[in-house]
A protein has these predicted regions:
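A donor-sugar binding/catalytic signature common to diverse glycosyltransferases
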Residues: 5-8, 96, 292-340
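C-terminal amphipathic helix plus adjacent low-complexity
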Residues: 91, 358-412
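Conserved nucleotide-sugar phosphate-binding/catalytic loop shared by glycosyltransferases and other
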Residues: 19-66
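Donor-nucleotide binding loops and adjacent catalytic segments primarily
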Residues: 197-306
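Conserved nucleotide-sugar donor-binding subdomain of glycosyltransferases
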Residues: 53-105, 147, 151-185, 189
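Active-site-proximal region of nucleotide-activated glycan assembly enzymes
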Residues: 117-203, 209
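Conserved nucleotide-sugar donor-interacting segment of glycosyltransferase catalytic cores
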Residues: 74-147, 200-201
Length: 412
């Protein structure tokens, strides 16, 4: 939600009227950010559903985690197509700006006959033979063998995703929305897709369409709630910051392994455990370690020498924006694809979840800490992100794509 409310603030600053729509669990965050909220889906996704789903998802990995994600995507698609149009029609929405994961928005926009712009907050789901499937974790390989490998991977991915694809196709048929049976990129707007993924952190992809834009992340330094932290417990040693994100963070063994791997390295480990692991359930943690449920991530990254991450897009981009190299432990969904880009750009080292142990992780941490090239590469991408000014560029693209009058920021 943070990137979307950041983008919404920028559009409102430029004089445009903005409101949010979504399931009830989105409402407190949206209203807390100062925006109007119009909800739908309360029967199928009542308040509290997200926390229950995240609690289940927090302990899943690999194909099991991906399967659970596909199931919720199908449910969300059907609910969105059914319940969003009346809400948006009543609100007299002129255009939709929607997270790319919610492919139901494509069919909603078709029903309402309004333009759709999609935002790729995670790894973009644009499936072309030039790059590996986002969930594969495969290295970039531009030759013919690599493209054949990718094509096979997409066929397997399509088989795995067939419940979501079947639901989308059925709703499109019912609504009279034509689909190209040969195009695996169903549900993508041909107007604009804006990716937070910077081009400097992506694989080269000559197949991307002209309406795809790498803007880089949306940051304005606003909108995040204050998070208390025990700053007086910092020892002055170099900081290793570790977070497994907000979804797959229910693995106590991972946190214990991270603590063991980082002990005795002359650094202080700061771990954000998240909502599904407590200090009690994590058990005794080795070394010079500060473990908290929630941490002020941006502030700690600015002080960190290294970030240990699940390779979620938001944490990876925030680490890079701070010029901090990573050790990535991808678990499921698009995290292997993000981790593959960490390896490709040499902004860090990848330790796959299935091969994780303290010895292997310690080796990776030492490599990144001792080889200055990782930090230099991270700083290079940080400079590219700063120069790109992703938030302003995204707002420009929205205005240009929708042919909106360019507004001046409203002061006061």
């Amino acid at each position: 939600m943070n990137p979307m409310t950041t983008l919404a603030r920028k559009m409102r600053e430029r004089g445009h009227e903005v409101f949010f729509t979504g399931i009830p669990d989105c409402e407190p965050f949206v209203r807390g950010a100062g925006f109007e909220f119009r909800g739908f889906g309360a029967r199928q996704f009542p308040a509290g559903f997200s926390e229950e789903w995240l609690a289940r998802q927090s302990r899943l990995h690999g194909l099991e985690g991906l399967r659970a994600t596909v199931e919720i995507l199908v449910q969300g698609l059907e609910m969105t197509v059914r319940e969003a149009p009346p809400v948006l029609y009543e609100a007299r929405a002129d255009a939709l700006v929607w997270d790319e994961v919610g492919r139901g928005a494509f069919l909603v926009a078709a029903q309402l006959d309004v333009p759709l712009i999609q935002i790729a907050n995670a790894l973009p789901m644009h499936l072309y033979d030039s790059v590996p499937p986002p969930f594969s974790g495969w290295p970039y390989r531009p030759d013919a063998i690599g493209k054949i490998r990718n094509r096979i991977g997409y066929a397997a991915f399509g088989y795995f995703m067939r419940p979501a694809l079947a639901a989308f196709s059925e709703h499109a048929r019912r609504l009279g929305v034509p689909l190209d049976g040969k195009d695996r990129n169903h549900g993508l707007s041909k107007l604009a897709c804006i990716a937070q993924l910077p081009s400097a952190f992506d694989f080269p992809n000559p197949e991307l369409p002209s309406w795809f834009y790498h803007t880089g992340p949306f940051h304005d330094g606003l909108g995040r709630p204050h998070t208390d932290f025990v700053w007086d417990r910092l020892s002055g040693d170099p900081i290793i910051y570790a977070s497994m994100g907000t979804v797959q963070n229910g693995f106590e063994l991972v946190f214990r392994t991270i603590a063991e791997a980082c002990s005795g390295l002359g650094c202080q480990l700061v771990m954000s455990l998240g909502s599904h692991v407590t200090q009690e359930s994590a058990g005794p943690l080795a070394g010079n370690c500060v473990a908290v449920r929630y941490a002020p991530q941006l502030e700690l990254l600015r002080r960190a020498a290294l970030c240990i991450t699940h390779a979620g897009m938001n944490t990876a981009l925030e680490s890079l924006a701070a010029g901090v190299p990573m050790v990535a432990i991808p678990i499921t969904n698009d995290q292997p694809g993000v981790a593959a880009r960490v390896a490709y750009t040499r902004t860090g080292v990848v330790v796959p979840y299935r091969r994780l142990n303290a010895v292997r992780l310690r080796r990776a941490v030492r490599e990144v800490l001792n080889d200055s090239r990782y930090r230099e590469n991270a700083r290079r991408i940080a400079a590219a992100v700063q120069a790109a000014n992703g938030l302003e560029r995204a707002a420009d693209i929205i205005e240009e794509s929708l042919r909106l009058p360019r507004q001046r920021p409203q002061n006061g």
